[in-house]
Amino acid sequence: MSSPKVGFVSLGRPKALVDSERILTQLRTEGYEVTPEYNDADVVVVNTCGFIDSAKAESLEAIGEAIAENGKVIVTGCMGVEESVIRQVHPSVLAVTGPQQYEEVVRAVHGVAPPRQDHNPYLDLVPPQGVKLTPRHYAYLKISEGCNHRCSFCIIPSMRGDLVSRPVGDVLSEAERLVRAGVKELLVISQDTSAYGVDIKYRSGFWNGRPVKTRMTELCAALSELGVWTRLHYVYPYPHVDEVIGLMADGKVLPYLDIPFQHASPRILRAMKRPAFEDKTLARIKRWREECPDLTLRSTFIVGFPGETEEDFQYLLDWMSEAQLDRVGCFQYSPVEGAPANTLDNPVPDEVKQERWERFMEHQQAISTARLSTRVGREIDVLIDSVDEEGAVGRSSADAPEIDGCVYVDSEQPLKAGDMVRVRVTDSDEYDLWGERIA
């Protein structure tokens, strides 16, 4: 008897990718075969993203493609909270579940394509690390669900709820399994990594027989014992973040912080319902770099937020010149259904949003170009991501996968994905580095 086959598509950010991995791991444990071909599958699961309108449009398009090619489609993920919208566009979907409803997704799959009764999970073992959708040498490590912030442009709390931290022992045990399976880089993710443990008052859990506090600093210290790269994403600049800089300076955690500042104008930050301490943030960035000179700072910003004036925007550009961030993403404000910001006065015209976005990107490109040029001549560690006929492409400690730059490596000896090599940097541009392997 052949195993039932499930087609799967995962949309959205890394946090959604981790949800997809969890669903796929459960299905594989029950004997399902995962196939990339829709027309070869007994059912297709679409894990959607519903954060902004463009993501919703992409999700609806993906659902439509799956229906056209297969006909039997189950929808899950963030957009699942808008079941009426999905069914209005695609009334033939078999089931719709929301984010984090893993068991409901699996039950829906059972209803369409029941698992084999003769499946023996002890003979058809799933890898200890579970099913991963990333390359073998890096993996996302989700430490919590939900968020306690109520930013006016965001609907994540209404979709995913308040912050719920995973037990620290579970997180560290998963990290151990990943490292044993060959992972060389752990990317710590959540909606708010720096708030880890606040919902349970930072109570201690146990890992390898010893207590570990459920708190970002203690988690990072424990992860450093695994001997692989640990990269922190989605960190808010709370005071205790200063403690992690010491771990970075000591080489225990990658000197990389992904902090979603979103803006710099105090007036706009208040409208966004975000902390408006841009002057203190600049002072802290200066202290962080004094303690850890190799620190890389990444952030994302929104331009064209309702009420943003030219003065607010210029304030942001001036702040960027002072902050000298290394890696930056920027988005034009887009209304999100259900977000409080939709009701704010003085929306910014689309042509002004576009013009400000272009000026912002040009401004930051100059900063990025200058900062990367200082790396020429230095020796850095590079984790190889891919190799083809043109050479090897990897990342340094300053580069997260998918969102940051790359290091193009010239090597006389063959390389493969997952190799960690020493490289002397020979050239740079706005986003990337080039170098020669020296060890």
UniProtKB/Swiss-Prot annotation:
**Class of the enzyme per the UniProt entry, highest EC level:** transferase
Which residue intervals define the domain Radical SAM core in the entry? 133-370
Domain MTTase N-terminal, residue spans:
4-114
Q: What is its EC number?
A: 2.8.4.4
InterPro entries xrefs: Elp3/MiaA/NifB-like_rSAM, Methylthiotransferase, Methylthiotransferase_CS, Methylthiotransferase_N, Methylthiotransferase_N_sf, NA-bd_OB-fold, Ribosomal_uS12_MeSTrfase_RimO, rSAM
Q: Please name the SUPFAM superfamilies in this protein's record.
A: Radical SAM enzymes
Q: Where in the cell is it found?
A: Cytoplasm
Q: Does the keyword Metal-binding apply?
A: yes
- Is Iron found in the keyword set? yes
Q: Which positions bind [4Fe-4S] cluster? A: 147, 151, 154
Query: Which GO terms of type biological process are on file?
Result: tRNA modification
Reaction catalysed by this chain?
L-aspartate(89)-[ribosomal protein uS12]-hydrogen + (sulfur carrier)-SH + AH2 + 2 S-adenosyl-L-methionine = 3-methylsulfanyl-L-aspartate(89)-[ribosomal protein uS12]-hydrogen + (sulfur carrier)-H + 5'-deoxyadenosine + L-methionine + A + S-adenosyl-L-homocysteine + 2 H(+)
- Cofactor binding note of this UniProt entry: Binds 1 [4Fe-4S] cluster, which is coordinated with 3 cysteines and an exchangeable S-adenosyl-L-methionine.
GO molecular function of the protein, one example? protein methylthiotransferase activity
The record, for SMART domains, names: Elp3
What residues does the TRAM domain cover? 373-439
Keywords linked to the UniProt accession: 4Fe-4S, Cytoplasm, Iron, Iron-sulfur, Metal-binding, S-adenosyl-L-methionine, Transferase
Any one cellular-component term (Gene Ontology): cytosol
- Pfam families, per the entry: Radical_SAM, TRAM_2, UPF0004
UniProt cross-references to HAMAP family, sorted A to Z: MTTase_RimO
User: Which family does the UniProt entry place this protein in?
Assistant: Belongs to the methylthiotransferase family. RimO subfamily.
Q: Which PANTHER family match?
A: RIBOSOMAL PROTEIN S12 METHYLTHIOTRANSFERASE RIMO, RIBOSOMAL PROTEIN US12 METHYLTHIOTRANSFERASE RIMO
Q: What's this protein's function?
A: Catalyzes the methylthiolation of an aspartic acid residue of ribosomal protein uS12.
Name of this protein: Ribosomal protein uS12 methylthiotransferase RimO
Q: Which gene encodes it?
A: rimO
